[in-house]
UniProtKB/Swiss-Prot annotation:
Motif ('HIGH' region): 10-20
Protein name (record): Glutamate--tRNA ligase
Alphabetized InterPro entries for the sequence: aa-tRNA-synth_I_cd-bd (IPR045462), aa-tRNA-synth_I_codon-bd_sub2 (IPR020751), aa-tRNA-synth_I_CS (IPR001412), aa_tRNA-synth_I_cd-bd_sf (IPR008925), Glu-tRNA-ligase_bac/mito (IPR004527), Glu/Gln-tRNA-synth (IPR000924), Glu/Gln-tRNA-synth_Ib_cat-dom (IPR020058), GluQ/Sye (IPR049940)
Listed GO biological process terms: glutamyl-tRNA aminoacylation
Its biological purpose: Catalyzes the attachment of glutamate to tRNA(Glu) in a two-step reaction: glutamate is first activated by ATP to form Glu-AMP and then transferred to the acceptor end of tRNA(Glu).
GO molecular function, one term: glutamate-tRNA ligase activity
UniProt family annotation: Belongs to the class-I aminoacyl-tRNA synthetase family. Glutamate--tRNA ligase type 1 subfamily.
Ligand binding (ATP): K254
Phylogenetic placement of the source organism: Bacteria, Pseudomonadati, Pseudomonadota, Gammaproteobacteria, Pseudomonadales
Amino acid sequence: MTTVRTRIAPSPTGDPHVGTAYIALFNYCFAKQHGGEFILRIEDTDQLRSTRESEQQIFDALRWLGIDWSEGPDVGGPHGPYRQSERGDIYQKYCQQLVDMGHAFPCFCTAEELDQMRAEQMARGETPRYDGRALLLSKEEVARRLAAGEPHVIRMKVPSEGVCVVPDMLRGDVEIPWDRMDMQVLMKTDGLPTYFLANVVDDHLMGITHVLRGEEWLPSAPKLILLYEYFGWEQPELCYMPLLRNPDKSKLSKRKNPTSVTFYERMGFMPEAMLNYLGRMGWSMPDEREKFSLQEMVDNFDLKRVSLGGPIFDIEKLSWLNGQWLRDLPVEEFAARVQKWAFNSEYMMKIAPHVQGRVETFSQVAPLAGFFFAGGVNPDAKLFESKKLSGDQVRQLMQLILWKLESLRQWEKDSITATIQAVVESLELKLRDAMPLMFAAITGQASSVSVLDAMEILGPDLTRFRLRQAIDLLGGVSKKENKEWEKLLGAIA
């Protein structure tokens, strides 16, 4: 009997997302329920954004939650390497195989040519897609241009008519017309594969039997299915899980909710409660009980109990469930967990240099730096009053700073400072106009340690969470303001 093998394959391009944890949990439970194996693979072909720091954060976040893997980049295994960036020769081999079989072809179109092609298609009211012009080139011309080293990508051929039947474990057969599919790029000009080629090759070579992924991938499933057909490989069972959503039913995003697993760890949530809550996202125990452990979920797991309605990720409900777990702890364990959470030596070493020179007794540390150990802060609204700025201007400035910080890739003091500086200059203000507001929002106080140092230490999710809290305290942002201010955002360098 074939061993069930599932996997999670996150990209190390930022903080570990709760959506990644959610999909990892369901893959883990499915594998363990069937006596199988759960694999961790790192999809790091985006060399500009992928970092080893983000990769380590993924490892740490999953292990904090209690989700472990039998094979992966850090533990090895018989199917490695487990980083896509280390599998380049493998992808080149299989991509060339597709070209040799006539299922893929070189495309020499420049970005400008592709832009013009799409613009013309849109002007005609057509769906923009690659028109296959490279297929009209003669073999001789293709060979000549390849020999000359002309930049090119490799695209896959797709049918122009008919439908692809996607067998989904949750929905049954889903029919998707082929005319919605583009001739997908499989290999980029830099020789690195795109998601589609790498995903299929890796899943096959690693013996993955079942793929549970987010439903946002369902529309592009025909491309993956076609690649399996081209290679002549057996396709894994497919399951497209419902997406996590904000309370307003929109797709879960960091603009409306903290989405980093690290944020919830820093906020003092229990990993057991976090897993419990993620397990209730579209799934329920046979007896409908709300509180259950990871092992209980594994023991009772059945995909038939997954609901397709968009599960709502609500921090208030998560907090309530976490409270249930906290209150059920023996008091000795509760005290031990509080101590472990609050007095993390690595975190304390980041804070200590900024506090030591400002206090005369240890008792002064908590009033000065207690905000480092809190989730949110409760600043007085009077702290946001400005002699130079109106209330509306204060909200606008803080909202623009929040938006710019959301797109910041490197969370370091210099880049944080440069981001705030860019916003204030775009509004023809000075940095000193913004800093008292940032002190109030981030520390809850009029003054403390350097707020820029504090933001770096607190991290992106906790910083953005407090900025959102401050903006809400001042009345929030209307839909009209949101639309107007987003136009300003686009003009900020």
